Amino acid sequence: IIESPDDLDKLRKSKYVQADASKVYADVKKILKEGRVVVFCGCGCQVAGLYATLKNVDISNLYTIDLMCHGGPSPKLFDDYLNKYHGKDQGKVADVGFRDKDYFGWSTEMTVKYTDGTVYHRTRTQDPYYRAFLPCISTRKFCGHCAYAKLPRTGDITLADFWGIQKYNRDYTDGKGTSIVSVNSPQGEKIYAAIADKLLLNKEIPCDDVLKTGQPFDHCFKNHPARQRYFEQIKNGSSMEKAYDYAIKDKYDVGIYGVWFGANYGSVATYYALHEIIRSFGLSVLMIDMPAAKTGAGKPDTHARRFAKAHYHESKRYTLKDMR
């Protein structure tokens, strides 16, 4: 919470990691009870969370701004990234910038500044944290089912980057960033009226044109299908590069071919023990299925098959012809 325009820099810049807003909620509640004005800015879920804590509190002095959200990556993953790749646990990290315009302009790239004055710059395809974040491989599971990335929005105003603005109107971009501002309520109208004449560009566009950009305005971004595999690899000790590569390309270190699907408990226990021993070495395992008699053949419903589905990664079933 800031009290002076001089401190606005503390609120600026993108922060692509989940934040704990619980203390801020208590502070906002206290300030509102004092009869003071509060402008709260956060993701849609954080705005909704704030309102949920303010029952029986006069909120006439509260103005809320929600951000169109890509989803929040795991805080532990971010902490591990800073420690393993940048030596945060050794006191080497001074600052992290997810979108540093000084180096990359209006874009999504990673900058880490070190205490010795050196700087790390990587594009979104080069940096392992960004590479997993943008396709929603590393975002939290519940972000893929967000209840707040929809219309009507939770905040009095919604803000977002207007990605693709040059396709809409080239005159509306200077390469430094153009924002979408959605006014959602009478409180939002008050805010916008107070700042409208201070904006460098102030053009009204149809809501349908915003929806066409594919932004998370009326829908959330779904988790990537490879998300679970990615975190399995991370949990098993893989680097972020290897976890991403194996999850995206469906790669494994070891393949086991045999009668692991055999309908007797001895076979099930033996192959499970082998599977777990290999995994204990930090290796990923694919259980290779027997050839199918014909293309598209299903798998029998046996206790061994049900056990395998719960504990293994299984290959598809191919005919001998398909495997050639």
What function would you assign to each model-found segment?
Residues I1-D250:
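Iron-sulfur-associated redox domains of electron-transfer enzymes in respiratory
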Residues Y252-G262:
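Nucleotide-activated donor-dependent transferases that construct or modify glycoconjugates
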Residues F281-R324:
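Active-site donor-binding segments of glycosyltransferases and PAPS-dependent sulfotransferases
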Residues L54-V57, I278, G282:
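Active-site catalytic pocket residues across diverse enzymes, especially alpha/beta-hydrolases
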